[in-house]
Amino acid sequence: FEKIVEIEDLVSINKENTEITKLNESAGVEKVKLSNLSYDILKKGIEYSKLSNGSYDITIGPLVKLWSIGLEGAKVPSKDEINEAIGYIDYNNIEINDSTKEAFLTKEGMEVDLGSIAKGYAADEVVKILKQEGIRSAIIDLGGNIYALGSKNSDNNWNVGIQDPFSDRG
């Protein structure tokens, strides 16, 4: 799926030279011009952060980085590390400009992580393509983010399990 690769190449924080990696590296230093797609995902992330009063906050990057979730070397960080990272988390410290599609993280050390919203955005794009192709039933798994389209078959709904986060993966 080319669309998924396109989105990942723009907004992943686990790849070098993505637009969001550049934004994070420029935190507290300078504005970054974004593509329409990256800007739209960032703006939607800010909107959801506001709607949840920060319970969902796209500037969670420093905290996510501590855990290294999904990467080699994943660990549970210390309380001190967590408390330090929390000081960088505040979506109100993102400035955006709709006319120039520029974004600025006002505090050095801030990091945006659009992984959750980008995966949802990518899933929505895949669903559009599948529906255009006449597919009415599918499970889309984008790194643990699941989209269930339709039902398993005419008699059964999809069953989705949730793994205990403290058990071994398997």
Segment roles from a protein language model:
Residues 1-170:
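Mature catalytic core of soluble alpha/beta enzymes
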